[in-house]
């Protein structure tokens, strides 16, 4: 009969941001431990509140199954002498495995024959195994930051105060630090902070409800979602959606209650984004909007307790928010006393990065890049692009951005509009930070796109140029996000440009700052972009189509995606596999290529002439289709060669003894390979 394991780790308040990952890590660790222990099990569920991490595992046996364990020892020639006598190595191995040396067997492996010891291992009682597994589980949860407490050697996100560990309702005994496992949990810190016994998981859930704790974060989240929408409607408006904040507050409380408050309508004179940021980032408040989407003078906050007099909580929250918004209004009014273009000079006193100079120097570099992009792609907006690039970092030295960094760019836009700047320039000031996250909004204008690409490209090339290259675990300058942002902007707006050319311009502008050879930096940055582009395309298209098309070049990203899309569509043909095999044979035999004209006079087999004639017939059309970017039509034209290619390989020995004949045949195949090589490298196609 299957049994249940229940574990709860009771702690001091753990930061909300730690909990989702901790839940996933708990599930992964216990799954691996149980599998390693040869234990079958069913559903695994994890739970978290600020004060507890818990898990339940269903379907466990009471006894571990018996097993036959085979352990490899030394190689045969080491384990036995020429006469078959066991060596000291064999005797030591047998002794270590607890078997008689005479029972050793031989096992064949890829590396040769080895001795092996086969022993039977009787299954142990599962509670005994869990007493060893659970301490490793508790101590193995990786947190971004952990701490020691008292004079203990153990670490955890926050000090542990109790542990509940039950298997089939019976305590699994173990200690972690100075805490001994038991069957006693505790209720809500403020509303029911007393111990209560636990019989099993179902009983635990019932007792938690009685003690004002909702262990399941998804249930807390749905409770909060339902209530904040209800309260917003009662207030005469609608909730401003914010899934990120909802996720966060669900891990800040054990028993959520919703509170509605208001603030003076006078504060609505402050830009909407500032008010939302102040409420969201600093107070974890939800905003309310009217039917037109206009911000209303109210907020919703989530409390961790039920109160007899909610008005006390409301007044306290309103008082705190009033102080915050008063600061915001003060900065907003004071900042307007200084023109944005005047603030630009102050960027000379702001160090962007020690080796890369000031923010003013950075602005000058990416301004030149942005102007070049405008020259190339839309000369009509060059002047506005230059102006937007000049002003876009000025709000960094404003009081508002100093207090609320999240509104950088937004405040630049607002101040620019208030000071009479062109509306497109003002919009681009905010847009140049986009996208701020994966899948986020992209610049809506060419001006914003050019400044955004230029700023991000300067950042990437500058950091790579002074050795600040992202590692697997660290990317402090968000270079991956910047590269992906550039790629998405280019694809979104159809910017036909040379990626290598723009990187070269950026490196030239950075030449006085580079601490590495420019050629090395160029190679590294191109590879960095290639990796991001491949990952992005692999989410949209078959991986082999991506690899094959990119192998033919990715300097023009718009063109590269067009080739990938065409190849992915071409793969849908019923005869694609046989086509791919034929063209892969061509690619594989002419890896280096032969650069010389084909001489029909050297043909010795009819299949040679037939292939050459077919090639000549489609060549001009395929090249024209390729040049115009109609890659699917180009591939369809190339497919017409399939029969002649197959016939050629069936009837012609490419590597003829006569060097001139051999070279002529390779030249013919080289021409064909280069015909479709402008679209993709078929050698990369899985077929």
Curated annotation (Swiss-Prot):
One of its GO terms (molecular function) is arginine-tRNA ligase activity. It catalyses: tRNA(Gly) + glycine + ATP = glycyl-tRNA(Gly) + AMP + diphosphate. Keywords: Aminoacyl-tRNA synthetase, ATP-binding, Cytoplasm, Ligase, Nucleotide-binding, Protein biosynthesis. The keyword ATP-binding applies. InterPro entries: DALR_anticod-bd (IPR008909), Gly-tRNA-synth_bsu (IPR015944), Gly-tRNA-synth_heterodimer (IPR006194). GO terms for cellular component: cytosol. SUPFAM superfamilies: HD-domain/PDEase-like. It is an enzyme of class 6 (ligase). Its EC number is 6.1.1.14. One of its GO terms (biological process) is arginyl-tRNA aminoacylation. It comes from the Bacteria. Coiled coil: none annotated. It is found in: Cytoplasm. Belongs to the class-II aminoacyl-tRNA synthetase family. Tetramer of two alpha and two beta subunits. This is Glycine--tRNA ligase beta subunit.
């Amino acid at each position: 009969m299957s049994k249940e394991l229940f574990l709860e780790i009771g702690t001091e308040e753990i930061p909300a941001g730690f909990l989702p990952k901790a839940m996933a890590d708990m599930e992964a660790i216990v799954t691996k431990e149980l599998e390693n222990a040869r234990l079958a099990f069913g559903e695994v569920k994890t739970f978290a509140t600020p004060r507890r991490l818990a898990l339940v595992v269903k379907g466990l046996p009471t006894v571990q199954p018996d097993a036959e364990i085979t352990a490899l020892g030394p190689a045969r020639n080491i384990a036995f002498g020429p006469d078959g006598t066991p060596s000291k190595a064999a005797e030591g191995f047998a002794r270590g495995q607890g078997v008689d040396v005479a029972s050793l067997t031989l096992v064949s492996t890829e590396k040769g024959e080895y001795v092996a010891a086969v022993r039977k291992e009787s299954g142990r009682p599962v509670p005994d195994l869990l007493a060893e597994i659970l301490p490793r589980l508790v101590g193995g949860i990786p947190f971004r930051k952990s701490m020691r407490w008292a004079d203990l050697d153990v670490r955890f996100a926050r000090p542990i105060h109790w542990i509940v560990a039950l298997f089939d309702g019976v305590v699994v005994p173990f200690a972690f630090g100075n805490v001994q496992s038991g069957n006693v949990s505790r209720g809500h810190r403020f509303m029911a902070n007393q111990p209560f016994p636990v019989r099993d998981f179902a009983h635990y859930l019932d007792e938690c409800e009685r003690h004002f704790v909702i262990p399941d974060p998804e249930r807390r989240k749905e409770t909060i979602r339902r209530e904040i929408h209800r309260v917003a409607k009662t207030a005469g408006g609608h909730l401003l959606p914010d899934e990120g904040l909802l996720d966060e507050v669900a891990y800040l409380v054990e028993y959520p209650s919703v509170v509605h408050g208001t603030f003076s309508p006078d504060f609505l004179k402050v830009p909407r984004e500032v008010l939302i940021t102040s409420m969201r980032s600093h107070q974890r408040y939800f905003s309310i909007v009217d039917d037109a989407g206009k911000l209303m003078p109210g907020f919703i906050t989530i409390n961790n307790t039920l109160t007899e007099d909610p008005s006390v909580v409301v007044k306290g929250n309103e008082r705190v928010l009033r102080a915050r918004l008063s600061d915001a209004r003060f900065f907003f009014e004071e900042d307007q006393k200084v023109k944005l273009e005047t603030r630009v000079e102050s960027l000379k006193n702001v160090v962007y990065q020690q080796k890369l100079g000031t923010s003013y120097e950075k602005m000058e570099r990416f301004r030149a890049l942005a102007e070049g992009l405008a020259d190339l792609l839309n000369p009509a907006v060059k002047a506005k692009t230059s102006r937007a690039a000049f002003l876009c970092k000025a709000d960094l030295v404003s009081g508002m951005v100093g207090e609320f960094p999240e509104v950088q760019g937004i405040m630049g836009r607002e101040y620019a509009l208030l000071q009479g700047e062109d509306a497109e320039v003002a919009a681009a000031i905010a847009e140049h930070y986009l996208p701020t996250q994966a899948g986020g909004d992209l610049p809506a204008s060419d001006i914003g796109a050019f400044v955004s690409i230029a700023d991000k490209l300067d950042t990437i090339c500058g950091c790579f140029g002074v050795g600040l290259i992202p590692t697997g675990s660290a990317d402090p300058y968000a270079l991956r996000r910047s590269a992906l942002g550039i790629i998405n902007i280019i694809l979104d707006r159809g910017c036909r440009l040379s990626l290598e050319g723009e990187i070269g311009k950026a490196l030239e502008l950075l030449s006085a700052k580079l601490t590495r050879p420019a050629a090395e930096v160029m190679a590294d940055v191109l590879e960095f972009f290639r990796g991001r582009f491949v990952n992005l395309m692999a989410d949209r298209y078959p991986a082999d189509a991506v690899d094959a098309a990119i192998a033919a070049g990715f300097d023009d990203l718009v063109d590269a995606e067009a080739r990938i899309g065409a190849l992915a569509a071409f793969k849908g043909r019923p005869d694609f596999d046989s086509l791919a095999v034929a063209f892969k044979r061509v690619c594989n035999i002419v890896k280096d290529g032969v650069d010389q004209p084909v001489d029909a006079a050297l043909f010795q087999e009819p299949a040679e002439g037939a292939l050459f004639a077919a090639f000549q017939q489609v060549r001009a059309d395929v090249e024209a289709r390729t040049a115009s970017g109609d890659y699917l039509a180009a591939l369809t034209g190339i497919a017409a060669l399939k029969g002649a290619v197959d016939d050629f390989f069936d009837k012609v020995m490419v590597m003829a003894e006569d060097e001139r004949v051999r070279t002529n045949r390779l030249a013919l195949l080289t021409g064909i390979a280069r015909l479709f090589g402008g679209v993709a490298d078929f050698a990369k196609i899985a077929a």
